[in-house]
């Protein structure tokens, strides 16, 4: 469970540990956590945008990537991607506790949506820089992105070196 892993990873860390950067161009654990919280919200916002349009099966052919390809592309850390400004950490939540709370609340709401939705997720679409994906694939993208962000931020490595 991603939420539990994130909580366990940062539980009990000092401010110095949360804000430590292994290099000037890397993100701290606090910044990684904020990026994950921002992304959870923003990517779900893309899904909400797709759901505002009518389902249209005639556009299925615009979706070129399979679910498996989406997941593989997102978690593949050799595929370096510059974070868009809207997803960069800015301190908007104020502190680590508020950041974690924002992520956990949004993740809980997103899971509830997934479990209860009756929306046609396969015939609504969103255009991303790498192509058109359907609304179901947006959910896969969101989930895989959180996993990738945890890996890229090297939580475990930094914790082991600085506890």
Give residue ranges: language-model regions.
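Short, contiguous alpha-helical
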Residues: 20-70, 115-163
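Acidic/histidine-rich alpha-helical segments that form the ligand environment
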Residues: 9, 68-121
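Start-of-domain marker
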Residues: 1-26
